[in-house]
Curated annotation (Swiss-Prot), chain A:
Amino-acid positions noted as binding FAD in the UniProt annotation, renumbered to this chain: 151-160, 184-186, 296, 307, 364-368, 393-395
Recorded name of the encoding gene: IVD
Organism from which the protein derives: Arabidopsis thaliana
Protein name: Isovaleryl-CoA dehydrogenase, mitochondrial
Keyword Transit peptide: yes
EC number(s) on file: 1.3.8.4
Length: 409, 282
C-alpha cells in the first residue's frame, strides 16, 4: 500500500529556496548507518509536513485545522517509537526517540513539545507501567494518532515541589474519587488519555501518591481555559479540574502508593527525550543564521566574513555539537539499561540553557531583522526558554545532580 | 511473439534471438524479477565546486544521495511488484564502499535485496552498461529500470547501452508504464521533443524513467529498521568478467565561465554587431 505525504516534486525542489542548511551533518561517531537513515527520513518528513506550518501555529496559537498533524505523525510511525510492535509501535529505544524529537523540534518547537508529551510522557509511561489490559485499551489509538495523550503532575501550588501536590484521590467502592486541579498540562485541552498523579494518602508524603489513567469525558473531569504562553504557542496547555471525578480501580497505573516511583523514574526519561527538543531548536537557529550571513552584505561584503559573526556562529555550532554528544551518549546508556538520574537531568540542563543562549545569538546575528517577527529567530528564542523550566526547572535539575554527587561515596 | 528466425541474419543475431525466446518463455511462466540500477551522486541541493586540480568535482565531505531519477525508477519497480507483476526488486549500485548507503536507502524504500559492485574507479556509461548486462545474464530479470540520466554527468546513455548489449527493447524517458501480464508487454508513454509517444515493448525490456513518472515514497521508519537485515551481495568487476578498459579519458573539468552582466545597446546596428562579432551567433 502506498503512503504519500505532501507532494515531492523534484522540479519543485530545484525551484524552491533552500530551507535546509547542511550544517546538520552531526558527527558520524554519534550514529550508525541505520540511525542516520532514520534521522534523514524523519528530517525530510518534518521539513515537508511540519515546518511549513510552524509560523502559523505560533501566530494563531493552535495546531493547523486543515491538516491533522497527530494522524500524519502516527502514519509515519513516530508516536510509538518506544512502544512494543504488537500495539503498533517500533519497539526501539530512547536513542531513536531523541533523534525523532530533535528533527521534529527543528521543524517546530511547539509541535515537538506536544509530540514529546504525547509520545514520551503519556505513551511511554503506559508502556513502562501499564498492565496488559491497560496497554491493549489505550496504546493502539494513542500510537496511531487518533487519540492524543498527556500527563499532569504539577498543580497551581505545586510546581517544583511536586510531591506537595494537593489533588486528592479518595478510595471508594470500585475506585477512587478525584478532587483538585492540575496546572500547565501540555495537550490538556485535546487529550483523550491522561496520566494524572494524585494523593491517595495525604499524610504519607511522597509515598501517598498514586498514578491514574484518566479518560476525557469522565464525569467530574474538565479542562479550564487554554493558557496564553510566551512561547511554544500552539502546543495547547491548560488547567485540569477534577470535581468528584470517579476513576475505576482498573485505571491505577502500577500500584496504589507507588506513584512517586512512576513519577520520578518517568521524569528521568522525560528529561532525556525532551533534551533533544533544545537540540532541534539550536539546529534551527543555525539553519536560519547561516544562509542569512552568507547573503546579507554590509560594507561591501557578506556579514559572515566578519570575525564577530564567525565567532558567534562558531560558538553556536560548538554548543550544539557538545550538547548533542551528551544527549545521545546518555540515550545510549539508557537503552543499555544504565539510567543515571544525574545525567538525565544533566542533558536537559545543559541543552536547554545553551539553546536559549544560541537563540539569543541567532537574533543578534540577524541584527535588526532578528527583532522582526517575520523572521523565525524570535520564535526560536521564545520556544527555547521553555526548556529551562518544564520537566523540572534548571534549579531543580541542579539540585538533583548536586545532591546526588554529595551523597555518593 | 517476436520474429525469431530470419534466414538472412547472422548467427550471432539468431542466437541472441534464441536467448530472447528462452527468456520470453521464462518470464511468461514465472513471476519476474526487476533489476533497478541506482547511482550515488552529489545531492541535488549541494553547491558544486570543482577540485583545484581540475580532475573532477569535489566529493569529499559533500552530501551524497541517490540520483533522483534512480529514486523514481525504484519507486516504479516497487509499484509494479506491489501490483503483483513481479516477485522481487533488486537494487544494484556500482562504486566505492559508500554505495552501500545508497543501497540501504533503496532497501528501506522496499527493495528486497541489493547488489554492490565495488570499485574505486570512475566508470563511464559503457562500462556500467557492460556490468549491468553481466548482472542481467546472472539474475535474468524481466525488467531493468534506470533513471533517464544521472544528475552528475547528465549522460543519458547507460539505459540505452544496456538494452543494446542485451538485445532487448528499450523505452526511455518513461512518463507512464502499464504492464500487461498475459501478453508480457509493457505500454510506455515517453516524453519526447515532439510531445508524448506511446510504445509497446515486449518483456524483457529496459525502461529509463523521467521526472513525471511518479513521486518516490519516503523510506518509512519500520522499513528502515527492516532494511538492516536485507542482504547486500558484494561483487567485483572481475567476478562479472567485464572488460573495464575505457576509450574515453577525462582531460579536464572546469567551471563554466562566470556569467557576465547584460549590456544595454544603443541601436539595432550595435546589437547585430555584437551578435555577430562577440557572441558569434549570427
Amino acid at each position: 500500500m502506498q503512503r504519500f505525504f505532501s507532494a515531492r516534486s523534484i522540479l519543485g525542489y530545484a525551484v524552491k529556496t533552500r530551507r535546509r542548511s547542511f550544517s546538520s551533518r552531526s558527527s558520524s561517531l554519534l550514529f550508525d548507518d541505520t540511525q542516520l537513515q532514520f534521522k534523514e527520513s524523519v528530517s525530510k518528513f518534518a521539513q515537508d509536513n511540519i515546518a511549513p506550518h510552524a509560523e502559523r501555529i505560533d501566530k494563531t496559537n493552535s495546531f493547523p485545522k486543515d491538516v491533522n498533524l497527530w494522524k500524519l505523525m502516527g502514519e509515519f510511525n513516530l508516536h510509538g517509537i518506544t512502544a512494543p510492535e504488537e500495539y503498533g509501535g517500533l519497539g526501539l529505544g530512547y536513542l531513536y526517540h531523541c533523534i525523532a524529537m530533535e528533527e521534529i523540534s527543528r521543524a517546530s518547537g511547539s509541535v515537538a513539545l506536544s509530540y514529546g508529551a504525547h509520545s514520551n510522557l503519556c505513551i511511554n509511561q503506559l508502556v513502562r507501567n501499564g498492565t496488559a489490559a491497560q496497554k491493549e485499551k489505550y496504546l493502539p489509538k494513542l500510537i496511531s494518532g487518533e487519540h492524543v495523550g498527556a500527563l499532569a503532575m504539577s498543580e497551581p501550588n505545586a510546581g517544583s515541589d511536586v510531591v506537595g501536590m494537593k489533588c486528592k484521590a479518595e478510595k471508594v467502592d470500585g475506585g477512587y474519587i478525584l478532587n483538585g486541579n492540575k496546572m500547565w498540562c501540555t495537550n490538556g485541552p485535546s487529550a483523550e488519555t491522561l496520566v494524572v498523579y494524585a494523593k491517595t494518602d495525604t499524610k504519607a508524603g511522597s509515598k501517598g501518591i498514586t498514578a491514574f489513567i484518566i479518560e476525557k469525558g469522565m464525569t467530574g473531569f474538565s479542562t479550564a481555559q487554554k493558557l496564553d504562553k510566551l512561547g511554544m504557542r500552539g502546543s495547547d496547555t491548560c488547567e485540569l479540574v477534577f470535581e468528584n471525578c470517579f476513576v475505576p480501580e482498573e485505571n491505577i497505573l502500577d500500584k496504589e502508593g507507588k506513584g512517586v516511583y512512576v513519577l520520578m523514574s518517568g521524569l528521568d526519561l522525560e528529561r532525556l527525550v525532551l533534551a533533544a527538543g533544545p537540540l532541534g531548536i539550536m539546529q534551527a537557529c543555525l539553519d536560519n543564521v547561516l544562509p542569512y550571513i552568507r547573503q546579507r552584505e554590509q560594507f561591501g561584503r557578506p556579514v559572515g566574513e566578519f570575525q564577530f559573526i564567525q565567532g558567534k556562529v562558531a560558538d553556536m555550532y560548538t554548543a550544539l555539537q557538545s550538547s548533542r554528544s551528551y544527549v545521545y551518549s546518555v540515550a545510549r546508556d539508557c537503552d543499555n539499561g544504565k539510567v543515571d538520574p544525574k545525567d538525565c537531568a544533566g542533558t536537559i540542563l545543559c541543552a536547554a540553557e545553551r539553546a536559549t543562549q544560541v537563540a539569543l545569538q541567532a537574533i543578534q546575528c540577524l541584527g535588526g531583522n532578528g527583532y522582526i517577527n517575520e523572521y523565525a529567530t524570535g520564535r526560536l528564542l521564545r520556544d527555547a526558554k521553555l526548556y529551562e523550566i518544564g520537566a523540572g526547572t534548571s534549579e531543580i535539575r541542579r539540585i538533583v545532580i548536586g545532591r546526588e554527587l554529595f551523597k555518593e561515596e | 511473439m517476436p520474429f525469431l528466425f530470419d534466414e538472412s541474419s547472422s548467427p550471432s543475431f539468431r542466437s541472441r534471438n534464441q536467448n530472447c525466446l528462452l527468456l520470453h518463455l521464462f518470464c511468461c511462466s514465472r513471476p519476474m524479477k526487476i533489476l533497478v540500477a541506482v547511482k550515488r551522486v552529489v545531492d541535488y541541493a549541494v553547491k558544486i565546486r570543482v577540485k583545484p586540480d581540475k580532475t573532477g568535482v569535489e566529493t569529499q565531505n559533500v552530501k551524497m544521495s541517490m540520483n533522483p531519477f534512480c529514486e523514481i525508477a525504484l519507486e516504479e519497480a516497487l509499484r509494479i511488484k506491489e501490483a503483483g507483476f513481479a516477485k522481487e526488486v533488486i537494487a544494484v549500485s556500482i562504486g566505492p564502499s559508500q554505495c552501500v548507503d545508497t543501497l540501504r536507502t533503496g532497501l528501506a524504500m522496499g527493495a528486497d535485496r541489493g547488489i554492490h559492485v565495488e570499485t574505486n574507479s570512475i566508470f563511464l556509461p559503457l562500462t556500467i552498461a557492460k556490468i549491468l548486462k553481466s548482472l542481467a545474464d546472472v539474475e535474468n530479470p524481466g525488467l531493468i529500470f534506470l533513471g533517464k540520466q544521472a544528475i552528475d554527468d547528465d549522460c543519458n546513455q547507460t539505459g540505452q547501452m544496456v538494452a543494446a548489449l542485451l538485445g532487448w527493447p528499450q523505452a526511455t524517458f518513461a512518463s507512464k508504464v502499464v504492464l500487461d501480464k498475459d501478453k508480457n508487454v509493457a505500454t510506455v508513454d515517453r516524453e519526447v521533443d515532439g510531445g508524448l509517444e506511446t510504445l509497446n515493448v515486449d518483456l524483457p525490456a529496459v525502461i529509463t524513467t523521467d521526472l513525471r513518472l511518479n513521486q518516490p515514497r519516503y523510506a518509512s521508519l519500520p522499513n528502515i529498521m527492516k532494511a538492516k537485515s536485507k542482504p547486500i551481495k558484494k561483487m567485483t568487476v572481475q567476478d562479472l568478467k567485464v572488460d573495464i578498459k575505457s576509450d574515453i579519458e577525462i582531460l579536464e573539468v572546469t567551471e563554466p565561465p562566470k556569467r557576465k552582466s547584460g549590456v544595454m545597446v544603443s541601436s539595432v546596428d550595435e546589437l547585430i554587431d555584437k551578435l555577430k562579432n562577440e557572441a558569434h551567433v549570427v
